[in-house]
Amino acid sequence: MTASPCAFPVQFRQPSVSGLSQITSSLYISSGVAANNRLMLSSNRISTVINVSVEVVNALYEDIHYVQVPVADTPTSRLCDFFDPIADHIHSVEMKQGRTLLHCAAGVSRSAALCLAYLMKYHAMSLLDAHTWTKSCRPIIRPNNGFWEQLIHYEFQLFGRNTVHMVSSPVGMIPDIYEKEVRQMIPL
């Protein structure tokens, strides 16, 4: 894995599933509920909130910049149209010493997928490494299979190779990183 994108060593990180999960020194992921918590936003010095949903309405605080990415959490939704623009936006906020919160409804699929795209583009991490890192910071992440297919294509665009592949399983096509888990859940 390349240098860790987080500013502090693994043993000092506190993975969070209900609040804001810190991914890098300037990027966080959360649910829609947490994204509307003024205390959480201010205590983490969030300057930009990116809402990756069609169902969550943000409470608009005047000192925070809001970006709307209206994408449903369905395998056919084209989240890939936002990989570059959102990664670029997160990077530009970081260059201005700001902090970004990416959120969707649960902080599991859409926001996680955009986080993985950002880590690949701006931290030169493979998709596998980006997923491993992000999951260590927010254990509940699990982009839907359509987003995985789009991320796999994006990784190939960026690096000319893939570290994650879609494979056949008893429940259909899944990313190979979930293959062992699925096989343990479903007896053959």
Swiss-Prot record:
GO terms for biological process: dephosphorylation; peptidyl-threonine dephosphorylation; peptidyl-tyrosine dephosphorylation. Signal peptide: none annotated. GO terms for cellular component: cytoplasm; mitochondrial inner membrane; nucleus. It catalyses: O-phospho-L-tyrosyl-[protein] + H2O = L-tyrosyl-[protein] + phosphate; O-phospho-L-seryl-[protein] + H2O = L-seryl-[protein] + phosphate; O-phospho-L-threonyl-[protein] + H2O = L-threonyl-[protein] + phosphate. Gene3D superfamilies: Protein tyrosine phosphatase superfamily (3.90.190.10). Its EC number is 3.1.3.16, 3.1.3.48. It comes from the Eukaryota. The keyword Membrane applies. It is an enzyme of class 3 (hydrolase). It is a peripheral membrane protein. It is found in: Cytoplasm; Nucleus; Mitochondrion inner membrane. The active site is at residue 104. PROSITE patterns: TYR_PHOSPHATASE_1, TYR_PHOSPHATASE_2, TYR_PHOSPHATASE_DUAL. Keywords: Cytoplasm, Hydrolase, Membrane, Mitochondrion, Mitochondrion inner membrane, Nucleus, Protein phosphatase. One of its GO terms (molecular function) is phosphatase activity. Residues 19-160 form the Tyrosine-protein phosphatase domain. Residues 95-141 are annotated as: Sufficient for mitochondrial localization. Coiled coil: none annotated. SMART domains: DSPc. Can dephosphorylate single and diphosphorylated synthetic MAPK peptides, with preference for the phosphotyrosine and diphosphorylated forms over phosphothreonine. In vitro, dephosphorylates p-nitrophenyl phosphate (pNPP). Belongs to the protein-tyrosine phosphatase family. Non-receptor class dual specificity subfamily. This is Dual specificity protein phosphatase 18. It comes from Bos taurus.
